[in-house]
């Protein structure tokens, strides 16, 4: 009879990281990475049970930040720099939720892409 011995994998500790927040009109995606860009934890409003228009609410962004930061704290993450992008209304509440998680914030960068007369925008809605 063969017996297998399970060895518990040791989690590496990361003290300095980057938080990428993508706030679109439809969803909020939060990713915690280390300095090299390797993902530590990730969450979105859709993965936290929000569906449809509720994914784009500030409360959904707050819950998403809470869930992703819980996983990141297991790795010992303490100091972060924030990179926030996108046109969504959830940006402000996502930032406030991060400040409430007791991280040391070193920098805040806005990485929203701004079109310089690129692709033609979609036609205006007629309701």
Swiss-Prot record:
Keywords of this entry: Ribonucleoprotein, Ribosomal protein, RNA-binding, rRNA-binding
PROSITE patterns attached to this UniProt entry: RIBOSOMAL_S11
Gene3D superfamilies per UniProt: Ribosomal protein S11
Keyword Magnesium: no
Gene Ontology process terms (BP): translation
Annotated Gene Ontology cellular component terms: ribonucleoprotein complex; ribosome
Matching InterPro entries: Ribosomal_uS11, Ribosomal_uS11_bac-type, Ribosomal_uS11_CS, Ribosomal_uS11_sf
GO molecular function: rRNA binding; structural constituent of ribosome
Alphabetical list of HAMAP family matching this protein: Ribosomal_uS11
Family: Belongs to the universal ribosomal protein uS11 family.
Subunit note: Part of the 30S ribosomal subunit. Interacts with proteins S7 and S18. Binds to IF-3.
Entry-linked NCBIfam families: PRK05309.1 (NF003698), uS11_bact (TIGR03632)
Function description: Located on the platform of the 30S subunit, it bridges several disparate RNA helices of the 16S rRNA. Forms part of the Shine-Dalgarno cleft in the 70S ribosome.
Protein name: Small ribosomal subunit protein uS11
Organism: Rickettsia canadensis (strain McKiel)
The organism's taxonomic lineage, starting at the top: Bacteria, Pseudomonadati, Pseudomonadota, Alphaproteobacteria, Rickettsiales
């Amino acid at each position: 009879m063969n017996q297998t011995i399970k060895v518990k994998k040791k989690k590496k500790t990361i003290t300095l990281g980057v938080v990428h927040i993508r706030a679109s009109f439809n969803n909020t995606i939060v990713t915690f990475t280390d300095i090299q860009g390797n993902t530590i934890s990730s969450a979105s409003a859709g993965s936290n049970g929000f569906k449809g228009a509720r994914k784009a609410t500030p409360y959904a962004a707050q819950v998403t930040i809470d869930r992703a930061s819980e996983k990141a704290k297991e790795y010992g993450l303490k100091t972060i720099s924030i990179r926030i992008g996108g046109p969504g209304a959830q940006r402000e509440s996502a930032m406030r939720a991060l400040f409430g998680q007791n991280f040391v914030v070193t920098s805040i960068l806005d990485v929203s892409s701004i079109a310089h007369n690129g692709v033609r925008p979609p036609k205006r809605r007629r309701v």
